[in-house]
From Swiss-Prot:
The lineage of its organism: Eukaryota, Metazoa, Chordata, Craniata, Vertebrata. Its EC number is 3.2.1.17. It is found in: Secreted. This is Lysozyme C-3. Residues 1-129 form the C-type lysozyme domain. Belongs to the glycosyl hydrolase 22 family. SUPFAM superfamilies: Lysozyme-like. Keywords: Antimicrobial, Bacteriolytic enzyme, Disulfide bond, Glycosidase, Hydrolase, Secreted. It comes from Anas platyrhynchos (Mallard). Lysozymes have primarily a bacteriolytic function; those in tissues and body fluids are associated with the monocyte-macrophage system and enhance the activity of immunoagents. GO terms for molecular function: lysozyme activity. The active site is at E35, D52. One of its GO terms (biological process) is killing of cells of another organism.
Length: 129
């Protein structure tokens, strides 16, 4: 599923991401834009053999199990396939686990490079939330 910007903002808010660990909703919508273009089916192979999955491009080396990444940790305790569902509940649950890990949203390279330190409120502007 490819979410509309405001539709995604509303879903993320409903699932408790607004100000989760101090990150406003705009940060999450911005990250999703640059990670997946709001597409839950997005996948991306990395040079280390791991794959990133879903709307927030969550990585199989650390966070989910795809059955083929060597030495995978699966810290979210989920198969990576659930991160590709239209329903983003599991992706958000895992994202909360990731952002609580000490490095915050810096875990997402796209957030670090494109969202951090910018006016992320523009990502939710005009949305009825």
């Amino acid at each position: 599923k490819v979410y509309e910007r405001c539709e995604l903002a509303a879903a993320m808010k409903r699932l408790g991401l607004d100000n989760y660990r101090g990150y406003s909703l705009g940060n999450w919508v911005c990250a999703a834009n640059y990670e997946s273009s709001f597409n839950t089916q997005a996948t991306n192979r990395n040079t280390d053999g791991s794959t990133d999955y879903g709307i927030l491009e969550i990585n199989s080396r650390w966070w989910c199990d795809n059955g083929k990444t060597p030495r995978a940790k699966n810290a979210c305790g989920i198969p990576c396939s659930v991160l590709l569902r239209s329903d983003i509940t599991e992706a958000v649950k895992c994202a909360k686990r990731i952002v609580s890990d000490g490095d915050g949203m810096n875990a997402w390279v796209a957030w670090r490079n494109r969202c951090k330190g910018t006016d992320v409120s523009r990502w939710i502007r005009g949305c009825r939330l």
